[in-house]
Amino acid sequence: TPSFLRRIKDEEKKEMVEEYQRYLAEKGKRVQSFVKPKSEQGVPVLFGSDPEVNLVEYDSEGETKIVAGMIYNAPNSHRSWNETFRDVKRMRDEEKKKVVDAYLSGRTQRWQKVGRAFENAYARFEILVNIGAWRDIHRHRMLSQQRQNFSCFHGYDVPPEITESGIEGQFRSAIGRVEDIFSKIVKHDPDLAQYAVTLAHRLRFMQWENLRQSFWQIELRTIPEGHPDYRHLCQKKFLLLEKVYPLIAPYMRTN
C-alpha cells in the first residue's frame, strides 16, 4: 500500500484503505476454484540443474513492425503507420537488414540502448528456474512478469559447489525436511507455505516483454561475470528469439 494511504487518520478513510488492501491481497484466492486439481496439471519436475525456458508466444510480423518503427519517426517521415508498415511488408529481407544496419550503426556497447522501434514486437516466455536466479531476473521492470506461488512442486537445483564439497547427501536431506514441512502447511494455506520454500526450489513464471527489453536483459544477464543460472536462462531466451526473429536477434551482444 502506498505510504500516504497508511498515514491516513480518518477512520472512514482507513476502512477504504483496508478494503483496497483486501482487494489486492485476495484476488488470487478469488480464482482458486477455477484451477484444475494437481493430478490434472501434469507431472512435476523431480530434480533439475538447468533452467527450462519456453517461448510460448511471439509476433509473426514483429520484425516488420520493428523496421517500420525505425522508419516511422525518421526526421523526414510524415506518412501514417499503416502506409509505412505496408511499405516495409513489401521489402525483401536484404532491404530490411539495411534499415536495421543503418539504425544501429555506431552501437558498440551493450549499455548503448536500442531505440523505441524495438518496442513494436513482443515475446512471451515461460520459465522454470530456481528462486535464487528468479530474484535477480524479476528486478527487470520494463516487462510484465507473473509468477506462481513459491512451492516444492517443481523440484530443486543442487548447486555444483554442493556436490564438489561432498555434502550433497546432507543438502538433499535438509531439502527433504523442508518439503515435509511445506506439504503440511500448503494444505491449509498456499500463501503461508511459501515461507517454507528454499531458494534452491524451482519456480514457474512468465515474462511478457518487448524486444527492446529483450536486448537489455539478455545482453546484461549473459555477461561472463554473471551467475551461471541466470546466464543460462538468458542464453536460452536468445536462442529461442534467434529462431523466430532471425533478422533482429543477431544484433544482440550476447555472451
Write out the residue ranges for each language-model feature:
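A conserved ligand/cofactor-binding region detector
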Residues: 1-255
